[in-house]
Amino acid sequence: MDIIRKISHFAGQTFGIWVIVFAVLGFSFPSLFTWISSYITIFLGIIMFGMGLTLQADDFKELVRKPWQVIIGVIAQYTIMPLVAFGLAFGLHLPAEIAVGVILVGCCPGGTASNVMTFLAKGNTALSVAVTTISTLLAPVVTPLLIMLFAKEWLPVSPGSLFISILQAVLFPIIAGLIVKMFFRKQVAKAVHALPLVSVIGIVAIVSAVVSGNRENLLQSGLLIFSVVILHNGIGYLLGFLCAKLLKMDYPSQKAIAIEVGMQNSGLGAALATAHFSPLSAVPSAIFSVWHNLSGSMLATYWSKKVKKKQAGSKSSNLSL
């Protein structure tokens, strides 16, 4: 069990690297990964099942302690990223399938990787976890409505079908995880250390499947999509941070909201695009998955070093006194 725990910890710590490696492999050897496309929803369901296994009462304490911060985080999550996605799609005159793909990822809840990045950034991790959890639980209703509102300009959208898909891929697996944890608490406590490894496998499988199935599209439109994804992600971080700052949240909470808004559940975006739209519509989600892990790591490192530098400065000033 110790070996699995160590492997799982290593996989979680190097998550972004594995996503990049398998994205490159999917692009270079597409025939090895295209078969995974049929199982994208299943892989996402496994990840969400793992989330259900790890949920606990403490995750909702922040909602009770500072409800307004959690509410602001969820509202920011579901307004900033969809609006930025729509603005980029409309302003840059993106092709319909790419526009819908960008809007899809923008309308998704926050990704669980944001909790890790917030922790590394010395941010308010409890707030990050609460916002991710609440936004994910609201996703079956909110995400389809937002997609219908913002994407109907380019392609027809069926919110009912999207609602059912999100129930199947997100909410039902989370509930199943909670039920399993309720009846098999001791067994789950022993197995929970392997969940980061399971999540990494699930995400790299989804990314490699989308990339391998869109090799030609990436050769034609990859640079455009990558540029839009970088803008989308970066503007999300900035506006999330400014929103929290304007509302006078403390600095750790500002960092949490910035990361929470900027990082999306791109696996859900890829699953919805694959099931309801074209393969090309899934590409922005796949690229977002690669990029936001890189940018999130860089931002977390910057903020972490800033905190350490400040602490070192205060220690030296105390010594001089």
From Swiss-Prot:
Annotated TM spans: 7-29, 35-57, 70-92, 98-120, 130-150, 160-180, 191-211, 222-242, 268-288
Topology feature Extracellular, residues: 1-6, 58-69, 121-129, 181-190, 243-267
GO cellular component, one term: plasma membrane
GO biological process, one term: sodium ion transport
Superkingdom to which the source organism belongs: Bacteria
One Gene Ontology term of the molecular function aspect: symporter activity
Keyword Ribonucleoprotein (UniProt): no
First-listed, main subcellular location of the protein, grouped into a coarse class: membrane
Lipid bilayer topology: Multi-pass membrane protein
Pfam families referenced in this protein's UniProt entry, alphabetically: SBF
Entry keywords, A to Z: Cell membrane, Ion transport, Membrane, Sodium, Sodium transport, Symport, Transmembrane, Transmembrane helix, Transport
Keyword Membrane: yes
Gene3D superfamilies (alphabetical): 1.20.1530.20
Subcellular locations according to the entry: Cell membrane
Ranges in the topological domain labelled Cytoplasmic: 30-34, 93-97, 151-159, 212-221, 289-321
NCBIfam families in alphabetical order: bass
Family to which this protein belongs: Belongs to the bile acid:sodium symporter (BASS) (TC 2.A.28) family.
PANTHER family: P3 PROTEIN-RELATED, SODIUM-BILE ACID COTRANSPORTER
Protein name as it appears in the record: Uncharacterized sodium-dependent transporter YocS
Species for this entry: Bacillus subtilis (strain 168)
